[in-house]
Protein backbone atom coordinates (compact mmCIF):
# COMPACT_ATOMS: atom_id res chain seq x y z
CA UNK A 1 0.00 0.00 0.00
CA UNK A 2 2.94 2.26 -0.80
CA UNK A 3 1.38 5.24 -2.57
CA UNK A 4 -1.33 5.85 0.03
CA UNK A 5 -1.55 9.46 1.23
CA UNK A 6 -5.24 9.77 1.99
CA UNK A 7 -7.34 7.44 4.13
CA UNK A 8 -11.15 7.51 4.00
CA UNK A 9 -12.62 6.00 7.14
CA UNK A 10 -16.15 4.84 7.89
CA UNK A 11 -17.65 5.64 11.32
CA UNK A 12 -20.30 3.13 12.47
CA UNK A 13 -18.86 -0.35 12.96
CA UNK A 14 -15.35 0.88 12.15
CA UNK A 15 -14.38 3.59 14.66
CA UNK A 16 -17.31 3.26 17.06
CA UNK A 17 -19.85 0.63 18.01
CA UNK A 18 -23.19 2.49 17.76
CA UNK A 19 -25.40 -0.56 18.25
CA UNK A 20 -27.39 0.54 21.31
CA UNK A 21 -28.14 4.05 20.03
CA UNK A 22 -29.06 3.07 16.49
CA UNK A 23 -31.17 0.00 17.25
CA UNK A 24 -33.00 1.59 20.20
CA UNK A 25 -33.76 4.73 18.16
CA UNK A 26 -34.89 2.63 15.18
CA UNK A 27 -37.30 0.68 17.42
CA UNK A 28 -38.58 4.01 18.76
CA UNK A 29 -39.16 5.40 15.25
CA UNK A 30 -40.83 2.22 13.98
CA UNK A 31 -43.03 2.00 17.07
CA UNK A 32 -44.19 5.60 16.50
CA UNK A 33 -45.55 4.70 13.06
CA UNK A 34 -47.22 1.50 14.27
CA UNK A 35 -44.52 -1.07 13.52
CA UNK A 36 -43.29 -2.28 16.92
CA UNK A 37 -40.30 -4.64 16.75
CA UNK A 38 -40.14 -7.53 19.24
CA UNK A 39 -37.24 -7.26 21.70
CA UNK A 40 -35.82 -10.63 20.67
CA UNK A 41 -35.72 -9.66 16.98
CA UNK A 42 -32.20 -8.80 15.86
CA UNK A 43 -31.99 -5.66 13.71
CA UNK A 44 -28.21 -5.14 13.90
CA UNK A 45 -28.05 -5.44 10.08
CA UNK A 46 -29.40 -1.87 9.81
CA UNK A 47 -26.10 -0.46 11.19
CA UNK A 48 -24.12 1.13 8.36
CA UNK A 49 -26.28 1.21 5.21
CA UNK A 50 -28.64 4.13 4.43
CA UNK A 51 -31.15 3.95 7.27
CA UNK A 52 -34.33 5.06 5.53
CA UNK A 53 -34.09 2.13 3.10
CA UNK A 54 -33.59 -0.30 6.00
CA UNK A 55 -36.60 1.07 7.90
CA UNK A 56 -38.69 0.78 4.72
CA UNK A 57 -37.54 -2.83 4.30
CA UNK A 58 -38.59 -3.70 7.86
CA UNK A 59 -42.06 -2.22 7.22
CA UNK A 60 -42.20 -3.80 3.77
CA UNK A 61 -42.90 -0.48 2.04
CA UNK A 62 -41.06 1.40 -0.71
CA UNK A 63 -38.33 3.79 0.41
CA UNK A 64 -40.34 6.66 -1.13
CA UNK A 65 -43.36 5.82 1.05
CA UNK A 66 -44.34 8.43 3.63
CA UNK A 67 -44.12 5.80 6.39
CA UNK A 68 -40.38 5.42 5.75
CA UNK A 69 -39.91 9.18 6.13
CA UNK A 70 -42.05 9.28 9.29
CA UNK A 71 -40.14 6.36 10.85
CA UNK A 72 -36.85 8.11 10.02
CA UNK A 73 -38.07 11.34 11.65
CA UNK A 74 -39.09 9.36 14.74
CA UNK A 75 -35.67 7.72 14.79
CA UNK A 76 -33.94 11.11 14.62
CA UNK A 77 -36.13 12.52 17.37
CA UNK A 78 -34.57 10.05 19.79
CA UNK A 79 -31.15 9.66 18.15
CA UNK A 80 -30.32 13.38 18.06
CA UNK A 81 -30.81 13.69 21.82
CA UNK A 82 -29.89 10.34 23.35
CA UNK A 83 -28.94 7.75 20.75
CA UNK A 84 -25.97 9.69 19.46
CA UNK A 85 -23.98 9.00 22.61
CA UNK A 86 -25.17 5.42 23.27
CA UNK A 87 -22.03 4.52 21.44
CA UNK A 88 -18.49 3.40 22.28
CA UNK A 89 -15.06 3.52 20.69
CA UNK A 90 -13.47 0.31 19.47
CA UNK A 91 -10.06 -0.50 21.04
CA UNK A 92 -6.98 1.52 20.02
CA UNK A 93 -8.90 3.91 17.76
CA UNK A 94 -7.51 7.12 19.27
CA UNK A 95 -3.91 5.88 19.33
CA UNK A 96 -4.15 4.62 15.75
CA UNK A 97 -5.66 7.83 14.36
CA UNK A 98 -3.06 9.89 16.22
CA UNK A 99 -0.21 7.76 14.83
CA UNK A 100 -1.57 7.92 11.27
CA UNK A 101 -1.89 11.69 11.46
CA UNK A 102 1.62 12.02 12.89
CA UNK A 103 2.95 9.85 10.05
CA UNK A 104 1.57 12.41 7.60
CA UNK A 105 -1.56 10.69 6.32
CA UNK A 106 -4.59 12.85 5.53
CA UNK A 107 -7.65 11.31 7.19
CA UNK A 108 -11.21 11.88 5.98
CA UNK A 109 -14.33 10.61 7.69
CA UNK A 110 -16.61 8.99 5.10
CA UNK A 111 -19.95 8.08 6.68
CA UNK A 112 -23.50 7.65 5.38
CA UNK A 113 -24.58 9.17 8.71
CA UNK A 114 -25.74 12.79 8.51
CA UNK A 115 -22.74 15.12 8.81
CA UNK A 116 -24.32 17.01 11.73
CA UNK A 117 -24.47 13.83 13.83
CA UNK A 118 -21.07 12.55 12.72
CA UNK A 119 -19.32 15.75 13.83
CA UNK A 120 -21.00 15.64 17.24
CA UNK A 121 -19.88 12.02 17.71
CA UNK A 122 -16.29 12.84 16.70
CA UNK A 123 -16.28 15.79 19.10
CA UNK A 124 -17.75 13.66 21.90
CA UNK A 125 -14.94 11.09 21.54
CA UNK A 126 -12.32 13.82 20.89
CA UNK A 127 -11.54 12.42 17.43
CA UNK A 128 -12.30 15.47 15.30
CA UNK A 129 -8.74 16.80 15.62
CA UNK A 130 -7.31 13.83 13.69
CA UNK A 131 -9.39 14.39 10.56
CA UNK A 132 -8.53 16.74 7.70
CA UNK A 133 -12.28 16.90 7.11
CA UNK A 134 -15.31 14.87 8.23
CA UNK A 135 -17.69 13.98 5.38
CA UNK A 136 -21.21 12.64 5.84
CA UNK A 137 -24.63 12.75 4.24
CA UNK A 138 -27.26 15.49 4.42
CA UNK A 139 -30.42 15.24 6.53
CA UNK A 140 -32.33 15.53 3.24
CA UNK A 141 -30.80 12.25 2.04
CA UNK A 142 -28.03 13.35 -0.33
CA UNK A 143 -24.87 11.25 -0.24
CA UNK A 144 -26.29 8.43 1.90
CA UNK A 145 -25.02 6.22 -0.96
CA UNK A 146 -21.37 5.40 -0.18
CA UNK A 147 -20.30 5.59 -3.82
CA UNK A 148 -21.84 9.06 -4.19
CA UNK A 149 -20.22 10.19 -0.94
CA UNK A 150 -16.78 8.99 -2.05
CA UNK A 151 -17.19 10.72 -5.43
CA UNK A 152 -18.04 13.93 -3.56
CA UNK A 153 -14.95 13.64 -1.31
CA UNK A 154 -12.64 12.96 -4.28
CA UNK A 155 -14.01 16.00 -6.09
CA UNK A 156 -14.04 18.36 -3.10
CA UNK A 157 -10.51 17.45 -1.99
CA UNK A 158 -9.15 16.88 -5.51
CA UNK A 159 -7.75 13.49 -4.52
CA UNK A 160 -6.15 10.92 -6.80
CA UNK A 161 -7.94 7.57 -6.18
CA UNK A 162 -4.62 5.73 -6.58
CA UNK A 163 -3.36 7.54 -3.46
CA UNK A 164 -6.45 6.70 -1.38
CA UNK A 165 -7.48 3.85 0.86
CA UNK A 166 -11.01 3.17 2.17
CA UNK A 167 -11.51 1.50 5.55
CA UNK A 168 -14.97 0.20 6.49
CA UNK A 169 -16.98 -2.73 7.82
CA UNK A 170 -19.80 -3.26 5.29
CA UNK A 171 -20.05 -4.22 1.63
CA UNK A 172 -21.16 -0.73 0.57
CA UNK A 173 -17.86 0.68 1.90
CA UNK A 174 -15.92 -1.76 -0.26
CA UNK A 175 -18.12 -1.57 -3.36
CA UNK A 176 -18.47 2.22 -3.18
CA UNK A 177 -14.70 2.66 -3.05
CA UNK A 178 -14.05 0.13 -5.80
CA UNK A 179 -16.45 2.03 -8.07
CA UNK A 180 -13.89 4.86 -7.96
CA UNK A 181 -10.71 2.79 -8.19
CA UNK A 182 -9.82 3.01 -4.50
CA UNK A 183 -8.13 0.13 -2.64
CA UNK A 184 -10.11 -1.21 0.30
CA UNK A 185 -9.59 -2.52 3.81
CA UNK A 186 -12.43 -4.30 5.62
CA UNK A 187 -12.49 -4.46 9.41
CA UNK A 188 -13.79 -7.82 10.61
CA UNK A 189 -15.06 -6.65 14.01
CA UNK A 190 -17.91 -4.47 12.68
CA UNK A 191 -21.37 -5.29 11.33
CA UNK A 192 -20.53 -6.90 8.00
CA UNK A 193 -20.83 -10.70 8.22
CA UNK A 194 -17.97 -12.89 7.05
CA UNK A 195 -20.07 -13.90 4.03
CA UNK A 196 -20.87 -10.28 3.15
CA UNK A 197 -17.22 -9.27 3.30
CA UNK A 198 -16.04 -12.33 1.36
CA UNK A 199 -18.47 -11.47 -1.44
CA UNK A 200 -17.39 -7.82 -1.44
CA UNK A 201 -13.76 -9.02 -1.72
CA UNK A 202 -11.75 -6.17 -0.15
CA UNK A 203 -8.02 -6.13 -0.84
CA UNK A 204 -7.21 -6.47 2.86
CA UNK A 205 -9.01 -7.57 6.02
CA UNK A 206 -8.00 -6.58 9.54
CA UNK A 207 -9.12 -7.96 12.89
CA UNK A 208 -8.47 -4.77 14.87
CA UNK A 209 -8.26 -1.11 13.89
CA UNK A 210 -4.61 -0.82 14.92
CA UNK A 211 -3.67 -3.46 12.33
CA UNK A 212 -4.08 -0.64 9.82
CA UNK A 213 -0.65 0.58 10.96
CA UNK A 214 0.97 -2.74 10.01
CA UNK A 215 -0.64 -2.60 6.56
CA UNK A 216 0.75 0.85 5.90
CA UNK A 217 4.35 0.25 6.98
Q: Where are the model-predicted features located?
A:
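Active-site neighborhood of HAD-like aspartate-dependent phosphohydrolases
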Residues: 1-45
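Conserved Lys-Pro-Asp/Glu-containing loop-to-beta segment of HAD-superfamily phosphomonoesterases
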Residues: 6, 145-174
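Helix-loop "lid/cap" segments that line or gate small-molecule binding pockets
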Residues: 29-30, 50-64, 121, 153-154
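Conserved H-loop
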Residues: 36, 128-132, 160
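A short, structured active-site edge motif that brings together acidic residues
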Residues: 46, 128-143
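Metal-dependent phosphoesterase signature
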Residues: 57-95
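Short, acidic loop-to-helix structural element flanking the phosphoryl-transfer center
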Residues: 81-109, 115-119, 144-147
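Acidic, Mg2+-coordinating phosphoryl-transfer loop and its flanking beta/alpha structural elements
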Residues: 165-204
Amino acid sequence: VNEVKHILIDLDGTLTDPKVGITTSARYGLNKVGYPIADHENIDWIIGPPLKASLAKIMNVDVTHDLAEQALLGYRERFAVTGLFENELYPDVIETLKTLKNQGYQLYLATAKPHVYAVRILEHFELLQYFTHPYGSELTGERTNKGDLIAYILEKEQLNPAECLMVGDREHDILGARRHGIETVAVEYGYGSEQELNLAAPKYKIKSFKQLLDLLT
